[in-house]
Amino acid sequence: MPEVTLTTLNGLKAKGEKITMLTCYDATFAKAASQAGVEVLLVGDSLGMVLQGHDSTLPVTTAEMAYHTASVKRGNDGALILTDLPFMAHATPEQAFANSATLMQAGAHMVKIEGAAWLAETIRLLAERGVPVCAHMGLTPQTVNVLGGYKVQGRQEAQARQMRADAIALEQAGAAMLLLECVPSELAAEITNAVGIPVIGIGAGSATDGQVLVLHDMLGLSLSGRVPKFVKNFMQGQPDIHSALVAYVEAVKQVSFPGSEHGFSA
């Protein structure tokens, strides 16, 4: 696959072609996913749950994120690598910069930070210093204790209004991409149309500029046995993992995934 850059992703949004993203934590799956055509590999702090067996992402450290980023880099075949800043790794803008530098040196092309408009100062500082940022809004797993669990965000009109305003504010602060998780499909569509940067969705309907799933979920692997509504098992009917990865890419590109059954209403 030709090397994917931010320019590539902006071009895909401009021409209306969907962007494909999957989580990835090691060299073998990095090679498999990138060779299947997945454009963005997300080294997610979800590794705390799917690899380490924790019940949340909170125990994951920056050092662990750097380790897995370096592993993904070694297997990657042209995809853009996006790495999460883990819990409390961006408590201050300067701390965010120091930890982002660690992740970029390990092989990340961009970092992802969970939050809302209060992130503007941090995003501005990172962007000014050459660190591209993806802002993660909606259901933010690092604040699951404040949110009261893994619940859809933005169903109330006041909350939806605030999310729209926050998305615009973060773009103006320098965010290069947005990720919306567990947001009503209509709201996700409005935010996607309101900003000029790529918007990736998970449980946010089909109108976003692209889709992401946790690798283990889309391969039918689950420690807990609980499968989120927005997940589809792409291993079903496929002879091997490569075919499942290709099927995911094709489904996103053809907008046959996600279907209405994978999204949420207001």
Curated annotation (Swiss-Prot):
Keywords: Cytoplasm, Magnesium, Metal-binding, Pantothenate biosynthesis, Transferase. Mg(2+) binds at D45, D84, E114. Its EC number is 2.1.2.11. It is an enzyme of class 2 (transferase). It comes from the Bacteria. Binds 1 Mg(2+) ion per subunit. GO terms for cellular component: cytoplasm. The active site is at E181. InterPro entries: Pantoate_hydroxy_MeTrfase, Pyrv/PenolPyrv_kinase-like_dom, Pyrv_kinase-like_dom_sf. Pathway: Cofactor biosynthesis; (R)-pantothenate biosynthesis; (R)-pantoate from 3-methyl-2-oxobutanoate: step 1/2. It is found in: Cytoplasm. Belongs to the PanB family. HAMAP family: PanB. Catalyzes the reversible reaction in which hydroxymethyl group from 5,10-methylenetetrahydrofolate is transferred onto alpha-ketoisovalerate to form ketopantoate. Homodecamer; pentamer of dimers. This is 3-methyl-2-oxobutanoate hydroxymethyltransferase. It comes from Pseudomonas putida (strain ATCC 47054 / DSM 6125 / CFBP 8728 / NCIMB 11950 / KT2440). The gene is panB.
